[in-house]
Amino acid sequence: MNIGFFCYEYYPLLVGGLGTYAIEITRKIKEFGNDISVFTLNDGNLSTYEIWNGIEIHRPMLVNVMDIFPIVVKEDLRRWGWHLKFFADIYTYNILSATKFVNLLIKKQRRKFDIISFHDWLSAFSGIICKQNTNLPAVFHIHSIEEQRSLGGGSG
């Protein structure tokens, strides 16, 4: 099986449990004889492509969208302050990852994938875009909900 795997947190950029899970599950998927292409965030200091432990990793180089992003997002997002840069980077990572997966790997290189796996809301944009443009089956993994992250208080 050939799997497209989208997770904003992956080796070597780990923030918490999501990245640890992603590393362990992709390692096991590979051990079972499957091929896996991981799409993850690039902090600007990493290779845009590498094979690590037999796992293909794509890290698109981000562009700065902060001059335009506040103009095109809703008011509630503009109130995020410096967190808006994080969201802009996440959104850009998703668009670039989906574009590379659909246009380069599938359309140009004619690679065959069996399923798309995308993890948490941080990679949901790319997973949904890839699903809509390829009609591949997709699995969306939710790793926690806001109530769990904020000890029941929400972000409001």
Give the predicted meaning of each segment.
Residues 37-110:
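A conserved catalytic-core segment of Leloir-type glycosyltransferases
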Residues 119-124:
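Short, solvent-exposed amphipathic helices
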Residues 70-71, 149-155:
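Short acidic, glycine/proline-rich loop/turn micro-motifs
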Residues 1-61:
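N-terminal subdomain of nucleotide-sugar transferases
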Residues 3, 115-117, 130-150:
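Active-site proximal beta-strand in glycosyltransferases
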Residues 14-18, 130, 151-154:
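Short, solvent-exposed loop/turn segments at secondary-structure boundaries
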